[in-house]
Swiss-Prot record:
<comment type="pathway">
    <text>Carbohydrate metabolism; tricarboxylic acid cycle; isocitrate from oxaloacetate: step 1/2.</text>
</comment>
<protein>
    <recommendedName>
        <fullName>Citrate synthase</fullName>
        <ecNumber>2.3.3.16</ecNumber>
    </recommendedName>
</protein>
<comment type="similarity">
    <text>Belongs to the citrate synthase family.</text>
</comment>
<dbReference type="GO" id="GO:0036440">
    <property type="term" value="F:citrate synthase activity"/>
</dbReference>
<keyword id="KW-0816">Tricarboxylic acid cycle</keyword>
<comment type="subunit">
    <text>Homohexamer.</text>
</comment>
<dbReference type="GO" id="GO:0006099">
    <property type="term" value="P:tricarboxylic acid cycle"/>
</dbReference>
<keyword id="KW-0021">Allosteric enzyme</keyword>
<keyword id="KW-0808">Transferase</keyword>
């Protein structure tokens, strides 16, 4: 599936797509 992953950490966040 085509999903969005968001990593949250100290100064902000980073999002990236993942293909499962």
């Amino acid at each position: 599936s085509d999903n969005s992953v968001v990593l949250r950490y100290g100064d902000g966040e980073y999002s990236y797509p993942v293909v499962d």
